[in-house]
Curated annotation (Swiss-Prot):
It comes from the Bacteria. This is UPF0597 protein VFMJ11_0655. PANTHER family: UPF0597 PROTEIN YHAM. GO terms for molecular function: L-cysteine desulfhydrase activity. Belongs to the UPF0597 family. GO terms for biological process: L-cysteine catabolic process to pyruvate. Pfam families: SDH_alpha. It comes from Aliivibrio fischeri (strain MJ11) (Vibrio fischeri).
């Protein structure tokens, strides 16, 4: 395997991984669990300091196994019973007794959450104290990327700044990667080298089934399924894509105790990169090898596009994740590379106005809408229809991706600020 392809696999294995619950509150849970481990006993008080963007994405989403919403319960539960060795699955084995103990800490005013001014989009600092010691853990740049630990005010760990950071914000820096090179890698790599990506199907389809079997959030997936059964809507590939993607997001945002295979720090975006591709593969009876190659396009393509702008911005990442999914769907349908590029262009043209106003139950609607856009855009591309140069869409897909990055990075910070202020008011 050439060295560039090895880098691609390292990227995928670094940011396409299982995550239990929305990754922003889980970030606080993880930091709190590490702080408790440093203390050697359960804390008596917990102070949580987070960036505006992490605050935004934690306000309205349920924390798995708790039945509750927000950063306070996430941090308290992580401190009381979290497993610091489990990363994004830190709360996988939390018990009802531990949740009740965490809630008691909150009820007694022992857990305080504050916003902290920082240039980092992903930032969380937790200070946990007991009668004897104080432990402080700082995460910055990635949901589990610890950059500093302090015990009783003394630094006991700091991330070596000379080492490459496994940050979601810099994952593609210095890597020779384009849509064309992703396509070549996906279609030419040895199957044995990429088949690990198939776990995405197992996890995210299980999450979708959970969302169909049980009531979570807005029940977007269940509602569409019920109306098909009533005859109000027709069953089709398009409806299957909408139902399963929405149901998976319903379950995830509603606190289901099943992990999602995340993409670039987001479970919803992992769903958006996975389920439409699975449904397209099922329709064409694609084998595991074909599906794995399609997953490489959707997951690595999404990572590449999103590397052009900061994580947790005012832009909904599902909008461009679905563009990469559309690329993969064209491939599964027997389309050409040029048609796959057209699918990306079409999707971005359709979804580029979608904002992020925090992680919550309505994400299921955005995930479903993005998935439907991927399907629509793939069909247009397969029939040789591509949007012309207009708006943020350029003649070349690479320039379009750069335009999206510019729009978000330069044009949307004020929008993000206003969204956060509205939510906090």
């Amino acid at each position: 395997m050439n060295s560039i392809w090895k880098q691609y696999i390292d990227i995928l294995q670094g940011v396409v991984k299982p995550a239990l619950g929305c990754t922003e509150p889980i970030c606080a849970a993880y930091a709190a669990s590490v702080a408790t481990q440093m203390l050697g006993s359960k804390p008596e008080t917990i102070d949580v300091f987070v960036s505006d963007n992490l605050y935004k994405n934690s306000m309205g989403v349920f924390v798995p196994r708790t039945g509750r919403v927000g950063l306070a319960i996430a941090a308290a539960t992580g401190a009381i019973g979290g497993n610091p060795d489990a990363g994004l699955e830190v709360l996988a084995k939390i018990t009802e007794e531990e949740v009740n103990e965490a809630q008691s800490l909150i009820d007694n005013g022992c857990v305080v959450v504050q916003r902290e001014t920082t240039d980092e989009f992903i930032y969380c600092r937790v200070i946990a104290k007991n009668a004897l010691h104080s432990a402080e853990v700082t995460i910055s740049g990635g949901h589990t990327l610890i950059i500093e630990k302090r015990l009783d005010g003394n630094i006991i760990f700091t991330l070596d700044s000379s080492l490459p950071k496994t940050s979601t914000a810099s994952i593609c820096d210095g890597v020779d990667i384009t849509i064309s090179s992703i396509y070549d890698f996906a279609t030419q790599a040895e199957f044995d080298d990429i088949k690990f990506i198939l776990e995405a199907k197992e996890l995210n389809i299980a999450l979708a089934q959970e969302g169909l079997n049980n009531p979570y959030g807005l029940e977007v997936g269940r509602t569409y399924q019920k109306n098909i059964e009533k005859g109000l809507l027709a069953k089709s590939l398009d409806s299957d894509i909408l139902i399963y993607t929405s149901a998976a997001s319903d379950a995830r945002m509603g606190g289901a105790t099943l992990p999602a295979m995340s993409n670039y720090g987001s479970g919803n975006q992992g769903i958006a990169a996975t389920i439409p591709v699975v449904k397209m593969a099922d329709f064409f009876n694609a084998d595991d090898e074909k599906l794995a190659r399609a997953f490489i396009m959707s997951h690595l393509g999404a990572i590449y596009i999103k590397s052009h702008y900061p994580p947790l911005s005012a832009f909904c990442g599902n909008a461009v994740t679905s563009a990469a999914a559309s690329m993969a769907m064209v491939y599964l349908a027997g389309g050409t590379f040029e048609q796959s590029c057209s699918a990306i262009q079409n999707t971005i043209s359709d979804t580029s106005g979608m904002i992020c106003d925090g992680a919550k139950s309505t994400c299921a609607m955005k995930v479903g809408s993005s998935a439907q856009s991927a399907m629509k855009s793939a069909l247009l591309a397969l029939n040789d229809h591509c949007v012309t140069k207009q708006g943020v869409i350029a003649d070349d897909v690479e320039k379009t991706i750069k335009n999206i990055g510019r729009m978000i990075t330069t044009g949307m910070p004020n929008i993000d600020h206003e969204i956060i202020e509205i939510m906090a008011s």
